[in-house]
Amino acid sequence: MGIKEDNWIRKMAIEEGMIEPFADSQVKLHPETGEKLISYGLSSYGYDLRISREFKVFTNVYNSLVDPKCFTEDALISIVDDVCIIPPNSFALARSVEYFRIPRNVLTVCIGKSTYARCGLIVNVTPFEPEWEGYVTIEISNTTPLPAKVYANEGIAQVLFFEGDAACDVSYAERQGKYQKQQGITIPFV
């Protein structure tokens, strides 16, 4: 199983719709204002995805218990904005700007960008399995004792693509994976 390079990622994005919308290079400046951005787009051996303007931030307003088998949205506040302030020692969910369609013989691993990690923000995204498609739900933990800012429409994590030596017997789509074709921020369910 080998990691895939920029030429392969570009070809799959353009010809197969693997990533939509697709930025063909690293974007570091806002195209209209010239303002510095947390980079996104194609890199040497990966693709830096962006975070959308949709966020769900954890709150304790209703004194809720977080239970992955019986999750309630009472624990979350929905925000649509160009920035999201994550409270100290708290957590937010978001979604990617990009829609992904993963080929049958490919598995991805997604790693948070170092710019955020160096600020105490930990980004977690589970692997994109063979034939999974959808917008990516992104988990962001603020491990600091201070509020932390996340910028919408800028880079948040890097996706690495690994091609298997052979196609899998059963894909995520064939297993009818529960997060297949997710459109927005998807909360946990069993």
From Swiss-Prot:
Gene3D superfamilies in the cross-refs: 2.70.40.10
Residues the record lists as binding dCTP: K113, S114, T115, Y116, A117, R118, Q158, Y172, K181, Q182
Keywords: Hydrolase, Nucleotide metabolism, Nucleotide-binding
Name by which UniProt lists this protein: dCTP deaminase
Pfam family name, one: DCD
Enzyme class (EC, first level): hydrolase
Listed GO MF terms: dCTP deaminase activity; nucleotide binding
Catalytic residues (positions): E139 (proton donor/acceptor)
Pathway(s) this gene product operates in, as recorded in its UniProt entry: Pyrimidine metabolism; dUMP biosynthesis; dUMP from dCTP (dUTP route): step 1/2
GO biological process entries: dUMP biosynthetic process; dUTP biosynthetic process; nucleobase-containing small molecule interconversion
InterPro entries the record matches: dCTP_deaminase, dUTPase-like_sf, dUTPase_trimeric
Organism for this UniProt entry: Chlamydia trachomatis serovar L2 (strain ATCC VR-902B / DSM 19102 / 434/Bu)
EC number annotated for this UniProt entry: 3.5.4.13
